[in-house]
């Protein structure tokens, strides 16, 4: 019998906010245990939640980016279950009428384009974390993560292969980073995926019994987990057994899924409206104000890049979204191709020599544009621009002061340059004669000698012009 795989996804993205969804605690990753947990995060009596406005804004940004409906009135609800890392005994989430509904994301697969329907995206708070082995033989609880704002993005069961799932997740991962709503760090848990997988005979409309796969933190492991679980369910059904509804844990070392617990349905959580939180009202004016601040959609950005850049250059920018954002700021001022060359040839190569990773904070776009302006005004040469960049990386200060400190101002005095060139021609009579005899490539020799004699300070445009004039006398 031929079996068809049916998959729906639940992706939890941690929103990039400085504070938590309902408390003022910080959300920095990697801090000492329980140093970023307010009384509310610990579930202490008498504490009340206050909604983080920035989390709402980021949820709306996502909804607009996937062409979804933004709910004008949505509600927070209590999702009731017991787990040690859930201090309150419930999680504040959204059940009916979530903030984002009915979106879509188009993916590219080996069979062509496919549209994946997004059923909903709702806000909820993250749970704490169980820490095993910190104290020998015991489990500790770290509530630093408790209350961190999550956006849970739920698809319809539209996937029919692991390839489609990975394509969607990569596209979604790229999108949320591009929008600036999530850093996408899978190792730190900022982008987590649960896979709901079932199988059915090919051509059958009715869905099979699904298993939920958890603990998958890389695209490669997601592919492996899906293929393993598909084979497991086929084996169970073909041997006369029944697939049970359960949550299964993926073990990357053993490349297998293991039963974790029975999978709950929505009614098991006994959702009810949170009495401490008013309905969330979003106006048309608020939505319009966010639309005006939205970056280009990734498809629109890609189309613009392809119009002006080579394929390899486009792929480089699309796979490095922080660099792409930086590039956009520079390109709008000096043009697409010059901006790419300045960033890759001058800036990134200088960063590499300094053994530093690219970050828009190291040399802000405004600083690079100021350096470029000095080159365009013939104040410094293109070659010396790298020295200015390197000095700024090492000790940030005013660009004008760096140019003065390094003595990089170009010499544009025509009389001085002409005298320099005449001296070089006089010192190299054989090369001058060869040039006049037709060996025009020697032009670069004289230009190089002039630039060397001026210690790189002579204006190269003037040097070229004057060398040509003097040799052709």
Curated annotation (Swiss-Prot):
Organism: Francisella tularensis subsp. mediasiatica (strain FSC147)
Annotated keywords: ATP-binding, Ligase, Nucleotide-binding, Protein biosynthesis
Biological role: Allows the formation of correctly charged Asn-tRNA(Asn) or Gln-tRNA(Gln) through the transamidation of misacylated Asp-tRNA(Asn) or Glu-tRNA(Gln) in organisms which lack either or both of asparaginyl-tRNA or glutaminyl-tRNA synthetases. The reaction takes place in the presence of glutamine and ATP through an activated phospho-Asp-tRNA(Asn) or phospho-Glu-tRNA(Gln).
Pfam families with a match to the protein in the record: GatB_N, GatB_Yqey
GO MF terms, alphabetically ordered: asparaginyl-tRNA synthase (glutamine-hydrolyzing) activity; ATP binding; glutaminyl-tRNA synthase (glutamine-hydrolyzing) activity
Family recorded in the similarity comment: Belongs to the GatB/GatE family. GatB subfamily.
EC number: 6.3.5.-
Any one GO BP annotation for this protein: glutaminyl-tRNAGln biosynthesis via transamidation
SUPFAM superfamilies reported for this sequence: GatB/YqeY motif, Glutamine synthetase/guanido kinase
PANTHER family the record matches: GLUTAMYL-TRNA GLN AMIDOTRANSFERASE SUBUNIT B MITOCHONDRIAL AND PROKARYOTIC PET112-RELATED, GLUTAMYL-TRNA(GLN) AMIDOTRANSFERASE SUBUNIT B, MITOCHONDRIAL
Cross-referenced NCBIfam families: gatB, PRK05477.1-2, PRK05477.1-4
Subunit structure: Heterotrimer of A, B and C subunits.
Gene that encodes it: gatB
Substrates-to-products reaction catalysed: L-glutamyl-tRNA(Gln) + L-glutamine + ATP + H2O = L-glutaminyl-tRNA(Gln) + L-glutamate + ADP + phosphate + H(+); L-aspartyl-tRNA(Asn) + L-glutamine + ATP + H2O = L-asparaginyl-tRNA(Asn) + L-glutamate + ADP + phosphate + 2 H(+)
Record's protein name: Aspartyl/glutamyl-tRNA(Asn/Gln) amidotransferase subunit B
């Amino acid at each position: 019998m031929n079996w068809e795989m049916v998959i729906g996804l639940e992706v939890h993205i941690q929103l990039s906010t400085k504070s938590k969804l309902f408390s003022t605690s910080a959300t920095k990753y990697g801090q000492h245990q329980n140093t970023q947990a307010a009384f509310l995060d610990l579930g202490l009596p008498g504490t009340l939640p206050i909604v983080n406005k920035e989390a709402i804004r980021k949820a709306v940004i996502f909804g607009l980016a996937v062409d979804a409906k933004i709910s004008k009135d949505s509600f927070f609800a209590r999702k009731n279950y017991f787990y040690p890392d859930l201090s309150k005994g419930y999680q504040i989430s959204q059940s009916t009428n979530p903030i984002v509904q009915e979106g879509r994301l188009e993916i590219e697969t080996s069979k062509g384009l496919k549209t994946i329907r997004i059923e909903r995206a709702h806000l909820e708070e993250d749970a704490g974390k169980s820490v095993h082995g910190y104290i020998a033989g015991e489990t500790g609880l770290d509530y630093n993560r408790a209350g961190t704002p999550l956006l849970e993005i739920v698809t319809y069961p539209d996937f029919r292969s692991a390839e489609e799932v990975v394509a969607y997740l990569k596209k979604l991962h790229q999108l949320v980073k591009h929008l600036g709503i999530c850093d996408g760090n899978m190792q730190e848990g900022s982008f987590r995926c649960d896979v709901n997988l079932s199988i059915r005979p090919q051509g059958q409309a009715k869905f099979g019994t699904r298993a939920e796969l958890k603990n998958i933190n890389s695209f490669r492991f997601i592919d492996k987990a899906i293929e393993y679980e598909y084979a497991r369910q086929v084996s169970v059904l073909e041997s006369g057994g029944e697939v049970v509804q359960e949550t299964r844990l993926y073990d990357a070392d053993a490349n297998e899924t293991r039963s974790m617990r029975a999978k709950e349905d929505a009614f098991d959580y006994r959702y009810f409206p949170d009495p401490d939180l008013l309905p969330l009202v979003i106006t048309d004016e608020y939505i319009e104000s966010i639309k005006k601040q939205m970056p280009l959609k990734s498809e629109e950005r890609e189309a613009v890049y392809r119009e002006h850049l080579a394929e390899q250059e486009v792929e480089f920018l699309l796979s490095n979204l922080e660099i792409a954002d930086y590039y956009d700021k520079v390109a709008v001022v000096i043009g697409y191709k010059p901006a790419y060359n300045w960033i890759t040839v001058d800036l990134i190569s200088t960063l590499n020599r300094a053994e530093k990773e690219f970050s828009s904070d190291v040399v802000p776009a405004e600083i690079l544009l100021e350096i470029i302006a000095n080159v365009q005004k013939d104040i410094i040469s293109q070659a010396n621009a790298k020295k200015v960049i390197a000095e700024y990386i090492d000790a940030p200060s005013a660009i004008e002061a760096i140019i003065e400190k390094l003595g990089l101002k170009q010499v544009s005095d025509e009389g001085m340059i002409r005298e320099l060139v005449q001296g070089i021609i006089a010192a190299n009579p054989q090369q001058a004669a060869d040039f006049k005899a037709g060996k025009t490539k020697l032009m670069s020799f004289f230009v190089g000698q002039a630039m060397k004699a001026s210690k790189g300070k002579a204006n190269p445009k003037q040097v070229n012009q004057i060398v040509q004039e003097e040799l052709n006398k």
